[in-house]
Every structure is written in structure tokens, then in C-alpha cells.
Amino acid sequence: MKKIVFTGGGTVGHVTLNLLLMPKFIEDGWEVHYIGDKRGIEHQEILKSGLDVTFHSIATGKLRRYFSWQNMLDVFKVGWGIVQSLFIMLRLRPQILFSKGGFVSVPPVIAARVSGVPVFIHESDLSMGLANKIAYKFATKMYSTFEQASSLSKVEHVGAVTKVSDQKNPEPDELVDIQTHFNHKLPTVLFVGGSAGARVFNQLVTDHKKELTERYNIINLTGDSSLNELSQNLFRVDYVTDLYQPLLELADIVVTRGGANTIFELLAIAKLHVIVPLGREASRGDQIENAAYFVKKGYAEDLQESDLTLDSLEEKLSHLLSHKEDYQAKMKASKELKSLADFYQLLKKDLS
């Protein structure tokens, strides 16, 4: 039986594509394995998926771009993770390793290359993260969501592979209940803060609940169960799975962070959106770059977190609603998306 090893983690964005691809390989008779951190979100997501995947936990160390005494300890963790991954590779002898990035992916990528296993990696952001910069040196091929520099000879630009489906599913009962609390004469605004929510969005909704719910129906994915609430023109929930796409479809506008997975999902369904990227003090600036790219393409509006107020947000929302047709036309004309089926066929072709 053919074997494939997946890796990637730290955030949901480093796991999502793997979760989409693994069922395809399982259906085609592959034995599927995953290397990650048993304490990480990658392990949680695989357990929730119920997929027939064997998980292998390794030691991980965070890759930092700044000086920290923890770097010394993490060098040893990464080294031990490489040794553990090498033993896994030599025992399994897989035909391929597929990496979605994140610091947990570096040891398996290095181990795969050392043991002669072809390495395929995927980069979602406009600029490569540190983990993928290292992984690229060991990769057989890299697939990218955005176009990359021509000097990167192993990169193939494939566009975004999203989890949003074109199929219309029956409305969940919970969605019907939510809609009974909404005023259908008002626009609906969905706040999406990534897998763990966004404190800045939660605080804005908490501080301005009265003003917001007088003008909009508000959906707030918080990442914090203590904020859960369903009341007039307001639905706050910590986490959703099957309800995610129905909520996207219900919303007129989405206010989101600038993670590539989320904004390309919005592009795929031509949903109006305001991007509030993580600042450079909290990230490497990749979300700022992603947001600027989407604004330049005419897909979205952006708003820096330091400038986020009720008034500044309402100005962006009003502008999007007033120019809805223009934004949606540009999104619908985009050639930057690839179906999961097409990407899977491309990956299989490259393996042959």
C-alpha cells in the first residue's frame, strides 16, 4: 500500500489544506500518516475529523526571528524532532511528504529529504514564512497561492485551494433559530477572527453592542465561550464547524483578519469584506501584505488595527455596501482559485 505523510500545524491555517487532501488519498487507497505535536491544534483537528490517519507526535521548537533565551532550548527540541522524524520516515518508507508549513513542519521536511522521500510544500501567503523558507531548501516542489519571485525555480503558482463549497446544503436548524432573532431589513455583518477569535473584534462588539445592533445584524465568532449569546440582532459564538459556511452565506459583509485561507474563501464566494490584519508587532507582517494585495486587486477594503474604531469601520462598511456590484464583479472575475479536485489531480500527476 502506498503511504503519504502530512505535516503542518500551529494554527488552523497550517492544517486546513491537509484536512481537505487526506480524505482524497484515503479514498484512493493510500495509508495516511501525520507528523505534528500532540499538544497542537493539528492533533485536535485530526481527532475531530474522524479520519483514518495515524498521528506521530514529535518534539517541536518555535522558530523566532528575534533574540530569546528560549531559542537555545528550542534548537535542541528541533534537533530531537528531526531525529524522531527520521526514525518515522525510515520505518514507514512513504512515497511522499506533504507539508503545509508552521514550525512543527521543519523537522519532518528535513528528515524526509535526508531519507530520500520527495517533499512537496504549500505556501499560502504573499511572502514565505520562516518555516517554509527553511523547508524550501529541502523541497522537491513548492505550490503557492500567490505568485512568487521567478528566482524561486521550484515554485508553481496554483492559486488558492479553499474549503468553501459551491454546493447549497439544507439550512441547519440552528441557522433558522438565529435568523428569527435578526431584522431582515438590516445588513448582516460577520466578524471572523481566525481559529482563536480576535480580541480586538470581541472588544469592539462588546463596547458598541447597542450601536452596532441598531444598524446591523451582528455575528461574532469569538473563540471565547464566555461571550456566547443569541439576542435581538446579535449572535456570538466561540466556534463553529458545519455552521461556518451557512453563516458566511448569511452575511452581507465579513470583517476578518488577513489570513490567506479566510480571505480566499471570501473571494471564492464573492463576499464583501473588510480586512483588519494583524500588525507587525504581533506577526511577521504577512497579513498586512495579503490585505494590501486584495485592496490593490479591488477585492476588499482594509483597516489597520490601530485605526479600528466604530466610526472607521462603519465608513468601510458603508463604502462596500454602496459599491457592492463593483467589488463582487472583480471577485467573480478572479482567476486565483483552484478547486480541491484539480489540485489533487495536479499533486498526483507530480507524484507519478
From Swiss-Prot:
Q: Which Pfam families is this protein grouped with?
A: Glyco_tran_28_C, Glyco_transf_28
Q: Which GO terms describe its molecular function?
A: undecaprenyldiphospho-muramoylpentapeptide beta-N-acetylglucosaminyltransferase activity
Q: Please provide the record's keywords in A-Z order.
A: Cell cycle, Cell division, Cell membrane, Cell shape, Cell wall biogenesis/degradation, Glycosyltransferase, Membrane, Peptidoglycan synthesis, Transferase
What EC number(s) would the UniProt record show? 2.4.1.227
Q: Note the SS bond partners.
A: none
Name a biological process GO annotation.
carbohydrate metabolic process
- Catalyses which reaction? Mur2Ac(oyl-L-Ala-gamma-D-Glu-L-Lys-D-Ala-D-Ala)-di-trans,octa-cis-undecaprenyl diphosphate + UDP-N-acetyl-alpha-D-glucosamine = beta-D-GlcNAc-(1->4)-Mur2Ac(oyl-L-Ala-gamma-D-Glu-L-Lys-D-Ala-D-Ala)-di-trans,octa-cis-undecaprenyl diphosphate + UDP + H(+)
EC primary class = transferase
Note whether Cell membrane occurs among the keywords: yes
Q: Gene Ontology terms, cellular component aspect? A: plasma membrane
Can you say what this protein is called? UDP-N-acetylglucosamine--N-acetylmuramyl-(pentapeptide) pyrophosphoryl-undecaprenol N-acetylglucosamine transferase
Can you name the source organism?
Streptococcus pneumoniae (strain ATCC 700669 / Spain 23F-1)
Q: What lineage does the source organism belong to?
A: Bacteria, Bacillati, Bacillota, Bacilli, Lactobacillales
